[in-house]
Amino acid sequence: MNLTVGVSDMKVSDDPKSVLVTYSLGSCIGVAIYDPVARIGGLLHFMLPESSLDPSKAKKNPYMFADTGIPALFKSAYQLGAKKQRIKVVVAGGAQILDQQGFFNIGKRNDMATRKIFHRNNVIIDHRDVGGNVNRTIRLAIKDGETSMKVSGRGEKKICLI
């Protein structure tokens, strides 16, 4: 059963029938996590790097920002039984789609914020596909952790994390 993760949204599951999917990651970033022992996975689709840009929005929806969404994703996975030392991580998105001149560089700023958060928390990113000017879609199957990424113009590829 597909569970769609929208923009500024997050889902975590331990149901082996679930497949988490987020579509059209442009400048946004998708973070997929999976604990292969507990068979718990989660997917976050955030828009902006820092909640300090709009603290009131971050309070209403922490999944909008990297610095509030990523910790919330991990916390939700831990509550279901995932362990930090076993978690595998896939990061995708961070493209420069609309802002071709690079004035805002939201995609690049999102990527930098993501890498900083993972580095600061001693979490390794197992697979990273970011930048460029293409949209990406991520799927995460909870039963086995199979992760696939569809990239505009490049087709779909499976990412083996276990």
State what each model feature region is.
Residues 1-162:
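Active-site microenvironment for binding and transforming phosphate-containing groups
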